[in-house]
From Swiss-Prot:
Residues 81-96 have a biased composition (Basic and acidic residues). Expressed at a high level in the embryonic mesoderm, with expression continuing after gastrulation and reducing from stage 12 onwards. Highly expressed in the embryonic anterior midgut rudiment and larval midgut. Keywords: Cleavage on pair of basic residues, Disulfide bond, Secreted, Signal. It comes from Drosophila melanogaster. Disulfide bonds join C31-C120, C43-C133, C119-C124. This is Insulin-like peptide 4. Its main location: secreted. InterPro entries: INSL3/INSL4, Insulin-like, Insulin-like_sf, Insulin_CS, Insulin_family. It is found in: Secreted. One of its GO terms (cellular component) is extracellular space. The gene is Ilp4. Possible ligand of InR/insulin-like receptor. Heterodimer of a B chain and an A chain linked by two disulfide bonds. Transmembrane segments: none annotated.
């Protein structure tokens, strides 16, 4: 009887130690609405520039953002090529004194795609999401 109690105590100790050694919160895969909600909760100052609008337009913005987050890689590559062409045009404009606004916007859009890829495909941690906050 004492041997059974000793075995159960060791089993309980082993289970407790194994739970303590696991990371508290590892990488979690979040896509679409779940990713947007995580960004809203974690990013106090927002993850994009926000303008208060009516709830109908907010729903439209959420749907648009979800569509962009779920956009296939081929579309992303095509937009990147288009962005490069715009960037060349912007470089010529810079010589004339026009600020390079097109390239800046392109960089911001690609940044949002990276968090979608990172969190949806590979999983991300709290610290990863915090890096994308404004």
């Amino acid at each position: 009887m004492s041997l059974i109690r000793l075995g159960l105590a060791l089993l309980l100790l082993l289970a407790t130690v194994s739970q303590l050694l696991q990371p508290v919160q590892g990488r979690r895969k979040m896509c679409g609405e779940a990713l947007i909600q995580a960004l809203d909760v974690i990013c106090v100052n927002g993850f994009t520039r926000r303008v208060r609008r009516s709830s109908a337009s907010k729903d439209a913005r959420v749907r648009d953002l979800i569509r962009k987050l779920q956009q296939p890689d081929e579309d992303i590559e095509q937009e990147t090529e288009t962005g490069r062409l715009k960037q060349k045009h912007t470089d010529a404009d810079t010589e004339k004194g026009v600020p390079p606004a097109v390239g800046s916007g392109r960089k911001l859009r690609r940044h949002r795609r990276r968090i979608a890829h990172e969190c949806c495909k590979e999983g991300c941690t709290y610290d990863d999401i915090l890096d994308y906050c404004a």
